[in-house]
Amino acid sequence: MSAKFAVAVTAIIKRDDTVLLLKRSPEKAHLPGYWDPCSGRMESGETPEQAVVREAFEETGLDVTPVRVLDTFHFYYGPQQEEFVGMTFLCRPLCHRGDGEVVLSAEHTEARWVKLGEVDGYEMADGLKDVLDALA
């Protein structure tokens, strides 16, 4: 039996008492229109910390530093039910491009800095609100 799996990382970017949430593109196959933090798969040769920094920059244009691991997760995704294991990092933004506006990739249609404790009105994947509530 093969033990192949992919490693995923998630960046919860916290600035003061807010976290950055991104609205998934309606073209996304998985959870279109849901709100989530930056996330993606780790590339060959990367550490989880390097991957979360890269993913945050690719999806938002923000330079971040990982502060600590908040959570670990495991799931199956897609028609082939690819197995993923991953880590959710609390990250702090270091600087912003331009005037501090988030620069979105094609994966998302909107970005919002949401106060901790006010995420209930946002449609999210199971478990994410629990992680965010623990930060409040």
Annotate each predicted stretch with a short phrase:
Residues K4-A6, K14, P32, P37, ...:
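Short connector loops at helix/strand junctions that flank enzyme active sites
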Residues T18-E58:
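Conserved Nudix-box catalytic region and its N-terminal flanking loop in Nudix hydrolases
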